């Protein structure tokens, strides 16, 4: 069994298909929007399931970096709060989800490379980490 990648390795691989300035800008906007929309959909579907999946995601991030896990927990708390403040339902979250994915694919068309998650599904969680690491200036060295 191959050793799992550390945060620096994941981010280096993610960066390979996120170099074009417009693609990066679209990802800065769309990745958090997708994350938020998924949380909104899950919370509206089943709050208990949303809690369990949120904890699993936090554990994934904690395995990579304690600082990253803290940053992502803060973002998730903001997402949860916004979802609870907004009217219940699915339409808003589906609209955000679809529009943000369109933005992602436009960015990758500009980049000329396929989205990373086609290579490994875990990149769906690395995208938000990429935004958080840059936004908060988190260190990415191996533990």
Where would I find each of the regions flagged by the language model?
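Membrane interfacial helix-start motif at the N-side
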Residues: 11-42, 57-67
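Membrane-interface loop-to-helix entry segments
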Residues: 23-29, 69-72, 121, 128
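Helix-adjacent hinge/juxtasegments
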Residues: 47-85
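Transmembrane alpha-helical segments that form the membrane-embedded catalytic/substrate-channel core
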Residues: 57-68, 72, 97-114, 131-134
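Hydrophobic transmembrane alpha-helices
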Residues: 76, 80, 90-104
């Amino acid at each position: 069994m191959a050793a799992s990648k550390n945060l620096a390795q994941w981010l280096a691989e993610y960066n390979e298909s996120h170099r074009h300035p417009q693609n990066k800008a679209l990802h800065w906007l769309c990745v958090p929007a997708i994350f938020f929309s998924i949380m909104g959909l899950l919370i509206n579907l089943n709050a208990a399931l949303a809690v369990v999946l949120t904890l699993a995601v936090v554990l994934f991030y904690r395995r990579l970096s304690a600082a990253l896990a803290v940053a992502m927990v803060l973002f998730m708390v903001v997402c949860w709060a916004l979802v609870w403040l907004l009217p219940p339902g699915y339409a808003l979250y589906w609209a955000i989800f679809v529009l943000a994915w369109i933005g992602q694919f436009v960015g990758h068309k500009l980049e000329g490379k396929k989205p990373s998650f086609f290579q490994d599904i875990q990149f769906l969680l690395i995208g938000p980490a990429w935004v958080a690491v840059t936004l908060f200036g988190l260190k990415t060295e191996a533990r």
